[in-house]
Regions:
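N-terminal auxiliary interaction/assembly segments of multi-subunit proteins
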Residues: 1-115
Length: 115
């Protein structure tokens, strides 16, 4: 995948953490994963990409970070709804990032959708 495309998602992810939650994100080095590679994160926001490039973009978070994002969001929910709201919040967060990233890389035709 093109570095411009990867960097657009990385930059917009960092911007979204700051603007939505006041969290300054410090990313590790972006990398490509092989199909079936395991990971250590409990919650994932996934996007399918087609067009000039094909693949999946994954925003993976530890549950403790998703819980902090949920706390900072100001959403009201019952204890029984907590996990559902955390997953929903990460999904919406991923959608915000994808919308901004696609705008930032308008020179490429990319169609983005949940896998």
């Amino acid at each position: 995948m093109n570095v411009d495309v990867i960097n657009a998602f990385l930059t917009e992810g960092m911007n979204a953490f700051q603007s939505m939650f006041g969290i300054t994100a410090t990313p590790n080095k972006p990398h490509l994963l092989e199909v079936g590679t395991g990971h250590q994160w409990e919650i994932s926001g996934l996007l399918g990409i087609t067009g000039h490039y094909k693949g999946i973009v994954a925003f993976r978070l530890h549950k403790i970070l998703a819980n902090k994002m949920l706390e900072l969001s100001g959403l009201e929910f019952t204890p029984e709804e907590h996990d559902e709201f955390a997953v929903g919040l990460v999904s919406e967060f991923t959608n915000v990032i994808s919308g901004h990233a696609v705008t930032a890389i308008k020179d490429y035709f990319l169609d983005i959708s949940p896998p």
